């Protein structure tokens, strides 16, 4: 008789990317980013990105931590729209005055120093996070406004007018900024806008993406697509590039977040090879280092600690940001603040060298995601053809120098506006989604990726991976599983996210039960589990019993995927640090499962027709060996890999000769092939 073996993992069925779901892009847009002209006369639509279904113009919005930007594809080109102050980027700030007026943008930021407790910024650093997240707790100590806990999530408490205290979610604050961008576009286009493409950092998790979409709804916008910021910037760089394939690294360092994406651009196909980043690193952190430095200087020179003085800190923050910007073009500046506190004027020089010293570790930290993305993409430094700088913080000379040194002196490409490139790409995406086509466009394809591995738990707590990190999305993958026990009528599908081999070390996203499975021996039912990630990075899971047709489906919502950037980094870091431990544990589980499967299959044989062909002594011998093995398994749940393998060999030494002899006596009928192989279609992991 053949040796029964543990059911192997079923072949993953890659159903492929549906071309209809892929994003078609223009290959040549006339001109570069155009300055917004004065609003056209009422009723002049201007050939904007119209929906084929009559849904109106679709705009592209870069919702940034510190600044936001809006664009539209119109008259065969992308136009970045200036706000009512004539500026093409708008501060992502919201404030409330004594008279109850709400200010958004420049007006809010300009009065922040005089009204710190009622001026809100950095909502993007709170959105989609948990109140208990380390980043939130750290930021709370630095923000002048009150951040409070509401159902485990951070909210902002602010007095909107005298005596009227309100609590806003980060989604609501972001919605206020989105509303301003929407109104800016409406004033320019002369029509109502209800649809948008909104960008997010590539390393935003599902909860943060869902929360961003919710902010759009609050702002009266249908967010047709969430697009990753570095991918949008790559469109701005490569939309008019033709010729041989190029590997492009997008280095996106903004006010509050940092992303690195590596893309292969080949005649209109934009394929993301890998992405990495830090959703809590950017210009705001560089400003904070300067503030900490000057607080110490003030304490030393004036004997005054302004750390608790929100107004003084507001003035200092404003001047530190100005100094940081100036040092990108000058080697020394002077930070001067009139009447910083108690009528005391402050004046202190700041050199570029000192600025670089204060932020040296943060600048070096940006190289870590670069190295990880390069490794994930499987590329060497010489394989990168272009380095594209995006985000205002990439203007810092030291950041540029570190990147240049890493790539052996290669100069970054400065052909795109770092402040506007993301909104440009979003506007192109909006145009394509709206169905806009003209004589200047050709079909182009964008292939983005999922940032983390997605899978489910199988027998022994093993993380069975269905969608590995950096898999192109949208994607759908199906794998067939089976039951772990006899007459099992319900299976629990537990969905996880992470890089470790055991589910206990990964993040549980959600779980559900598939019931009504027809009672059958262990291993007989076939349950097809399908993971589907849409173009926004949102996951849905379907489980179906092939025999009965019963199915259950869930969409993993933001509530289910409450995962902070710190946890993402921990998952990847621990996966790298404990890879050997993961491998050993997986091998231990595999060895135990192999022994259990062999015991089960021999017991099944003893209960079948082959048992009738056994002689009494043979049957007793096999039954005794199986009983001893079963008892040993029950008494040794934590045995090592070698112990399980040795026990399996001992059992095989007893059972295989008997089964082989019976098989030969029966003329080869009623048994399994001697090599023990079974059809792969019936071989499935157990749930």
UniProtKB/Swiss-Prot annotation:
Protein function: Functions as a chaperone during endoplasmic reticulum (ER) stress response.
GO biological process, one term: chaperone cofactor-dependent protein refolding
PANTHER family on file: HEAT SHOCK PROTEIN 70KDA
Pfam family, one: HSP70
Taxonomic path: Eukaryota, Viridiplantae, Streptophyta, Embryophyta, Tracheophyta
Listed Acidic residues bias regions: 676-687
Protein name: Heat shock 70 kDa protein BIP4
Gene Ontology molecular function terms on file: ATP binding; ATP hydrolysis activity; ATP-dependent protein folding chaperone; heat shock protein binding; protein folding chaperone
Cellular compartments per GO CC: cytoplasm; endoplasmic reticulum chaperone complex; endoplasmic reticulum lumen; membrane; nucleus
Motif (Prevents secretion from ER): 684-687
Cross-referenced InterPro entries: ATPase_NBD, BIP_NBD, Heat_shock_70_CS, HSP70_C_sf, HSP70_peptide-bd_sf, Hsp_70_fam
Induction: By dithiothreitol-induced endoplasmic reticulum (ER) stress response. Induced by tunicamycin-induced ER stress response.
Xref: SUPFAM superfamilies: Actin-like ATPase domain (SSF53067), Heat shock protein 70kD (HSP70), C-terminal subdomain (SSF100934), Heat shock protein 70kD (HSP70), peptide-binding domain (SSF100920)
UniProt keyword list: ATP-binding, Chaperone, Endoplasmic reticulum, Nucleotide-binding, Signal, Stress response
Region (Disordered): 662-687
Protein family (similarity comment): Belongs to the heat shock protein 70 family.
The UniProt record lists the keyword ATP-binding: yes
């Amino acid at each position: 008789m053949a040796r029964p073996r543990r059911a192997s993992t079923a072949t993953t069925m890659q159903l492929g990317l549906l071309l209809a779901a892929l994003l078609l892009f223009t290959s040549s847009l006339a001109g570069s980013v155009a300055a917004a002209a004065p609003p056209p006369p009422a009723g002049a639509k201007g050939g904007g990105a119209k929906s084929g279904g009559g849904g109106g113009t679709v705009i592209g919005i870069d919702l940034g931590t510190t600044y936001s930007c809006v664009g539209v594809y119109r008259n065969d080109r992308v136009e970045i729209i200036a706000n009512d102050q004539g500026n093409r980027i708008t501060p992502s700030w919201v404030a409330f005055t004594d008279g109850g007026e709400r200010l958004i943008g420049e007006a809010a930021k300009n009065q922040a120093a005089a009204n710190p407790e009622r001026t809100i910024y950095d909502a993007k650093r709170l959105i989609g996070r948990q109140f208990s997240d380390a980043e939130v707790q750290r930021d709370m100590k630095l923000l002048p406004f009150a951040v409070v806990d509401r159902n485990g999530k951070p909210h902002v408490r602010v007095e909107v007018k005298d005596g009227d205290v309100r609590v806003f979610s980060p989604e609501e604050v972001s919605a206020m900024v989105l509303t301003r961008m929407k109104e800016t576009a409406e004033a320019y286009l002369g029509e109502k806008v209800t649809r948008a493409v909104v960008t997010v950092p590539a390393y935003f998790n599902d909860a943060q993406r869902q929360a961003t979409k919710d902010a759009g709804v609050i702002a009266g916008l249908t967010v047709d697509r969430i697009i990753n910021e570095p991918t949008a910037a790559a469109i701005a760089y490569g939309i008019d590039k033709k010729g041989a394939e190029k590997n492009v690294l997008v280095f996106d360092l903004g006010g509050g977040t940092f992303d690195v994406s590596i893309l292969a651009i080949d005649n209109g196909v934009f394929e993301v090879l890998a992405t990495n980043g830090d959703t809590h690193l950017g210009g705001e952190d560089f400003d904070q280092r300067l503030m900490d430095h000057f607080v110490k200087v003030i304490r030393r020179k004036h004997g005054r600690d302004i750390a608790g003085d929100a107004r003084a800190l507001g003035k200092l923050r404003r001047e530190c940001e100005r100094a940081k910007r100036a040092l990108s073009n000058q080697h020394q500046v002077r930070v001067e603040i009139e009447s910083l506190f108690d009528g005391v004027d402050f004046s202190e020089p700041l050199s570029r060298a000192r600025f670089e010293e204060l932020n040296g570790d943060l600048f070096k930290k940006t190289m870590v995601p670069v190295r990880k993305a390069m490794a994930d993409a499987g590329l060497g430094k010489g394989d990168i053809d272009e380095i594209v700088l995006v985000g205002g913080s990439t203007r810092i000379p030291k950041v540029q120098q570190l990147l240049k040194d890493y790539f052996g002196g290669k100069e970054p490409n400065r052909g795109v506006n770092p402040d506007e490139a993301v909104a440009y790409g979003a506007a192109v995406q909006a145009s394509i989604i709206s169905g806009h086509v003209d004589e200047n466009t050709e079909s182009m394809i964008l292939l983005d990726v999922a940032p983390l591995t997605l899978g489910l738990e199988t027998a022994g707590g093993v993380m069975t991976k269905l969608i590995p990190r950096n898999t192109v999305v949208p994607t759908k993958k199906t794998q067939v599983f089976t039951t772990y026990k006899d007459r099992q009528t319900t299976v629990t599908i537990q969905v996880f996210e992470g890089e470790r081999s055991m589910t206990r070390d990964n993040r549980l996203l959600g779980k559900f039960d598939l019931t009504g499975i027809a009672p059958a021996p262990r291993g007989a039912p076939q349950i097809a589990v399908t993971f589907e990630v849409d173009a926004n990075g949102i996951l849905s899971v379907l489980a179906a019993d092939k025999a009965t047709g019963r199915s259950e489906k869930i969409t993993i919502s933001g509530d289910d995927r409450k995962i902070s950037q710190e946890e993402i980094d921990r998952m990847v870091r621990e996966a790298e640090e404990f890879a050997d431990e993961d491998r050993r544990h997986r091998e231990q589980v595999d060895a135990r499962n192999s022994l259990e499967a062999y015991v089960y299959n021999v017991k099944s044989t003893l209960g079948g027709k082959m048992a009738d062909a056994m002689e009494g002594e043979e049957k007793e011998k096999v039954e005794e060996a199986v009983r001893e093995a079963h008892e040993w398994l029950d008494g040794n749940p934590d045995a090592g890999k070698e112990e399980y393998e040795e026990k399996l060999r001992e059992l095989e030494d007893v059972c295989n000769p008997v089964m082989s002899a019976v098989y030969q006596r029966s003329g080869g009928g009623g048994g399994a092939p001697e090599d023990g192989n079974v059809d792969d279609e019936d071989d499935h992991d157990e749930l």
